[in-house]
């Protein structure tokens, strides 16, 4: 699913996995691949290749997310928060460069807000709306591929994704 929607490349995934022999190596391997792709994306954007840059940022977003996937002991750990913010930033760069029609949203919940995105298909509405929320380890950004947002938009469906109440702590940031 994620590779089909552009959030991964089989060659990059296999190359990254080949360097992982222990759980301790996991975060560093995925972080390195994400950083490599962020560089590719920056150079592509500077060169005027915005779509290619957006594709690289989308993959970097997923690889950043992979880098902290197993980090559950300390949700306030600086490395986790840094990786979370980087995956969010990469995702937002991808949306902008790929020209994905969206709005950032905040849904009131108890004494906080659940942040997410509303994706709107081309054409006049009304549009059927799909609502997808993330779970404990899935930020709203990951739901872009998990919920099949590109496929839904292509079929005229609007999609709302948002962090769940048990999501990673930075869910309350925009």
Task: Identify what each model region corresponds to.
Residues 66, 78, 85, 116, ...:
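Short alpha-helical interface elements
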Residues 21, 49-51, 61, 93, ...:
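Histidine (H) residue identity feature
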Residues 74, 81, 108, 151-154:
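Short, surface-exposed, charged/polar-biased interaction segments
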Residues 1-94:
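Alpha-helical protein-protein interaction scaffolds
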Residues 30, 34, 80-125:
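N-terminal cap/lid segment of alpha/beta-hydrolase-fold proteins
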Residues 122-125, 129-174:
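Cap/lid segment of the alpha/beta-hydrolase catalytic domain
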Residues 25, 58, 63, 70, ...:
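Generic hydrophobic secondary-structure signal
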